[in-house]
């Protein structure tokens, strides 16, 4: 499937992990991207309050969620968790969104930004920035996906 450069808009990018979620956002023209502090995943999804605050503060109009597919582009258990979290975000935030193949984004951000052995979440947010930059170049366009069922593994 070939994607095309999406229309410019200010969006939030998520690198969803088991313990933390890396965050990055771009300006409405998709010219600059910036990282935000990673948030810890907590019970009852209490991190959504922080995410909502970022959306309001930066006037974000959509979001993307990285999917850690394997080398062949197939789903992994972590990718399924990311898809389910994306659906949760869609249902809670009521914003258009899309998934982006993030295979090797953490490795790329580690090499590109020189981050090693990070436990602060900085590498997660830089991975979200890499995912965002990929989306800006390649898409796909954001869609209204709220209410779709969760994927089981």
Curated annotation (Swiss-Prot):
Gene3D superfamilies: YqgF/RNase H-like domain (3.30.420.140). Keywords: Cytoplasm, Hydrolase, Nuclease, Ribosome biogenesis. Its EC number is 3.1.-.-. GO terms for cellular component: cytosol. One of its GO terms (molecular function) is nuclease activity. CDD domains: YqgF. One of its GO terms (biological process) is rRNA 5'-end processing. InterPro entries: RNaseH-like_sf (IPR012337), YqgF (IPR005227), YqgF/RNaseH-like_dom (IPR006641), YqgF/RNaseH-like_dom_sf (IPR037027). It is found in: Cytoplasm. Its main location: cytoplasm. Belongs to the YqgF nuclease family. This is Putative pre-16S rRNA nuclease. The lineage of its organism: Bacteria, Bacillati, Cyanobacteriota, Cyanophyceae, Synechococcales.
